């Protein structure tokens, strides 16, 4: 079983990363994508045109699709991200833009509805925050929608919050 660990932690001393490492401990088949080291660019019009042309020709060999293929092939997805501004760092949204590829992680049915193609049975969203976050964690809610669209049936939320509140 392959676990894809999408690491959206900004530094190695991250409390979120510590929680993720504890979750992943003992799992021998972890592929890690360190987003802050990838320098992924947000899509501009030129990239969109290139991607559309490749998708229309089902030309999946371009390196532009490597992250999407990796995501689609994983048995489990673990998203590790700090709680920033009610959700997550922008680098994680940029990653999802690169992963969301019609024909790899989902496709459209004849009725025009998206249908997931991912192998994963579960997506685990791990986060930490200095204050409260469970009342409004739009990051997890976003990934629940992504999991549904990509055909991943289970989502789980693991959070350590109030880490900077004295007395908690």
Task: For each feature predicted by the language model, list its residue ranges.
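Solvent-exposed loop/turn segments at secondary-structure junctions
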Residues: 85, 130-132
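Short, well-ordered beta-strand core segments
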Residues: 77, 123-124
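Glycine-rich phosphate/pyrophosphate-binding loop and the adjoining helix
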Residues: 134-168
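Short, conserved loop/helix-junction motifs that constitute active-site signature segments
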Residues: 114-120, 150-151
